[in-house]
């Protein structure tokens, strides 16, 4: 087993292990295509894409596993619950940005106050939109009823 797990770049002082999963080309390709790491995206578009994905999948657990799952209003309550969680996540992103990026006003990258604000607003718009699209799809497709 020791031939599979070894220090990263054969340097034992880095504090990271090189495993077949962490150093594989497929893993690097997959992680490189995630919106947070993709080159050429503005913080607003990064937040929009991440928010759409999160909003889309957040409505399902509230709809299927929520306390009103057997009522006729389960989908609407699931939508409002997803909206509430999106508000909490947006508040958390805002607080993180205010605490982490004090005095870094300039720049359009994600590691500045302006970039993080753009990311947060894109996330909230995308998440509300993604949850709304999921609601419309679940409400209008009879397969899920």
Curated annotation (Swiss-Prot):
Pfam families: PsaL (PF02605). One of its GO terms (cellular component) is chloroplast thylakoid membrane. Disulfide bonds: none annotated. Keywords: Chloroplast, Membrane, Photosynthesis, Photosystem I, Plastid, Thylakoid, Transmembrane, Transmembrane helix. It is a multi-pass membrane protein. SUPFAM superfamilies: Photosystem I reaction center subunit XI, PsaL. GO terms for biological process: photosynthesis. Its main location: plastid. The keyword Plastid applies. InterPro entries: PSI_PsaL, PSI_PsaL_sf, PSI_suXI. The chain crosses the membrane at residues 48-68, 75-95, 125-145. It is found in: Plastid, Chloroplast thylakoid membrane. HAMAP family: PSI_PsaL. Belongs to the PsaL family. This is Photosystem I reaction center subunit XI. It comes from Emiliania huxleyi (Coccolithophore). The gene is psaL.
């Amino acid at each position: 087993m020791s031939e599979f797990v070894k220090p990263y770049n054969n340097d034992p002082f880095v504090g990271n292990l090189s495993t077949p999963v962490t150093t594989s080309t497929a893993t690097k390709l997959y992680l490189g295509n995630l919106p947070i790491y993709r080159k050429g995206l503005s913080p607003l578009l990064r937040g929009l894409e991440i928010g759409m994905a999160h909003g889309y999948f957040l409505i399902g657990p509230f709809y299927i596993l929520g306390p009103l799952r057997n009522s006729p209003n389960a989908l609407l309550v699931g939508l409002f619950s997803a909206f509430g969680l999106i508000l909490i996540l947006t508040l958390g992103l805002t607080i993180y940005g205010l605490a982490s990026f004090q005095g870094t006003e300039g720049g359009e990258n994600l590691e500045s106050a302006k970039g993080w604000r753009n990311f947060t607003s894109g996330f909230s718009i995308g998440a509300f939109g993604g949850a709304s699209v999921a609601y419309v799809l679940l409400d209008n497709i009879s397969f899920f009823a």
